Each structure stands twice: as C-alpha cells, then as structure tokens.
Regions:
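Conserved, structured core segments of small domains
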Residues: 1-93
Length: 93
C-alpha cells in the first residue's frame, strides 16, 4: 500500500531543527528498507511530506511512532492512503 504522510509541526522551528538530524537518520534507515520513497520539508516550513510504501497502515504507524520528531513531540503525523493505480512505475510497484 502507498501512503502520503503529512507531518504538521507542533513546536517552534528551532525545536524541530534540534531534532532534525535524528529524524533524518530515522527516515533514511527506513528508506534503505524500502518504506520511505520520497521526503521533503514543506515550503514554507510548516511540516514535512513523506511518500511511504508499507504492507499496511499499522506497520507504518509503528514506524512513525518511533520517529524522533514524534517521540520529541514536535510533529503530528497525518496518514493518507492512496491508490497505486497510476504510480506503479514511479515507485517500483
């Protein structure tokens, strides 16, 4: 299944940036495992966007629960499921 994860900042940018290196390490580790396919900070910096592939929502929720941003209380993740019909080639599905 494919998902868009919208990360909504719930703390000042200075607090977010203090945790950012650990967050990026978490994202990159799961990218190597094939979960996160693309990610970026939103512009203006009000949060982030992740494109994720996961067998199910529960698995993705567990990964997000271990994200340093979530553990640090600086983001609120919003998960949106979307159809893979038009993106299979783009994300290797």
């Amino acid at each position: 299944m494919l998902f868009v994860v919208l990360l909504h900042y719930t703390a000042p940018l200075s607090a977010v940036d203090a945790i950012r290196p650990a967050h990026l390490e978490h994202v990159e580790r799961h990218a190597r495992e094939g979960v996160f396919r693309a990610w970026a900070r939103r512009d203006p910096p009000a949060g982030g966007v992740l494109i994720a592939a996961s067998p199910n929502r529960e698995t993705l929720e567990a990964i997000l629960a271990r994200d340093p941003y979530v553990l640090g209380g600086v983001v609120r993740p919003e998960i949106v499921t979307f159809s893979e019909a038009n993106v299979r080639g783009l994300f290797g599905g």
